[in-house]
C-alpha cells in the first residue's frame, strides 16, 4: 500500500511513495557505491541485467518482493544453516497490521529475515525503523526508504527529543491504522552487543503516545 496521503509532517522520516520509486531507482543504478555494495553480496552479479530488473520495479512492493527478497535470501544461504519461523498462530488472523518488536543483534538482518519469513507465509512485509546514524551516504537513505523503511532521528538535542519521539510515535500509529502496514522496531536503541535484550521503559512510552 502506498503512503501518498501521508501528512507533510512525516516527509523527512517516511518511506518513499510509489510516485518517487522511478527517480530513486535511477539514482541507485547510477551510483557506483551501490554497485560495489551489491557486488560484495553477489560477486558474480551482472550489473546490466540487474539494472534492467531494477528499472522494471514500478512500486516499493515490487522491489521488496523481488530484488530485496533475493538479496536477503542470498545472505541467508551464505551465512546461515536455515531460517525458521514460529508463532504463526499469534499473527492476526485477518492479516491486520501490528507492531513487531524484537531483539537487535545485526544492523539490518533482524528485520530483513523477519520480512522474508513473513512474506513466505503470506503475511505482508513490515515497514522497518532505521536510525539516521546508519545513513552515512545519500544512496543508503534512498535505498532504505525504497525498501519501505522509516527514519528514526537519533542525533537530536534533549530539547528536540520529545518532539521527535511524538512525531515518530504518530507516524507508527499512522502506518498501522491508516496505511495498514505493520512496523518493526528494535527493542532498544542500537544493537545489543552485550547480549542484554531488556527493553527500556522509554519504548513502552513510545507505543503509548
What is the predicted role of each segment?
Residues 58, 62, 155-162, 194:
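Charge-dense, low-complexity intrinsically disordered segments
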Residues 87-183:
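Glycine- and small hydrophobic-enriched segments that form the cores of compact globular domains
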Residues 1-98, 104-115, 119, 141, ...:
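Membrane-anchoring hydrophobic helices of lipid-metabolizing enzymes
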Residues 204-209:
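Conserved small/polar residues in nucleotide/adenosyl-binding loops
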Residues 175-203:
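Catalytic-site beta-strand/loop segments enriched in glycine and acidic/polar residues
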Residues 65-69, 165, 200:
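A structural signal for well-ordered alpha-helical scaffolds and beta->alpha junctions
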Amino acid at each position: 500500500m502506498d503512503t501518498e496521503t501521508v501528512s507533510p509532517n512525516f516527509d523527512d522520516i517516511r518511506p518513499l511513495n510509489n510516485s518517487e520509486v522511478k527517480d530513486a531507482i535511477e539514482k541507485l543504478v547510477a551510483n557506483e557505491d551501490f554497485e560495489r555494495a551489491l557486488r560484495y553480496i553477489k560477486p558474480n552479479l551482472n550489473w546490466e541485467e540487474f539494472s534492467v530488473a531494477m528499472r522494471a520495479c514500478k512500486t516499493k512492493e515490487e522491489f521488496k518482493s523481488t530484488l530485496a527478497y533475493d538479496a536477503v535470501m542470498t545472505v541467508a544461504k551464505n551465512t546461515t544453516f536455515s531460517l525458521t519461523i514460529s508463532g504463526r498462530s499469534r499473527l492476526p488472523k485477518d492479516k491486520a497490521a501490528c507492531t513487531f518488536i524484537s531483539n537487535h543483534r545485526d544492523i539490518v538482518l533482524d528485520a530483513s529475515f523477519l520480512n522474508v519469513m513473513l512474506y513466505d507465509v503470506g503475511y505482508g512485509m513490515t515497514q522497518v525503523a532505521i536510525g539516521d546514524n546508519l545513513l552515512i551516504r545519500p544512496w543508503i537513505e534512498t535505498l532504505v526508504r525504497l525498501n519501505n523503511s522509516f527514519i528514526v532521528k537519533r542525533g537530536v538535542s534533549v530539547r528536540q527529543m520529545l518532539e521527535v519521539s511524538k512525531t515518530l510515535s504518530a507516524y507508527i500509529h499512522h502506518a498501522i491504522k491508516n496505511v495498514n502496514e505493520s512496523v518493526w522496531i528494535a527493542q532498544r536503541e542500537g544493537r545489543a552487543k552485550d547480549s542484554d535484550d531488556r527493553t527500556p521503559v522509554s519504548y513502552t512510552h513510545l507505543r503509548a503516545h
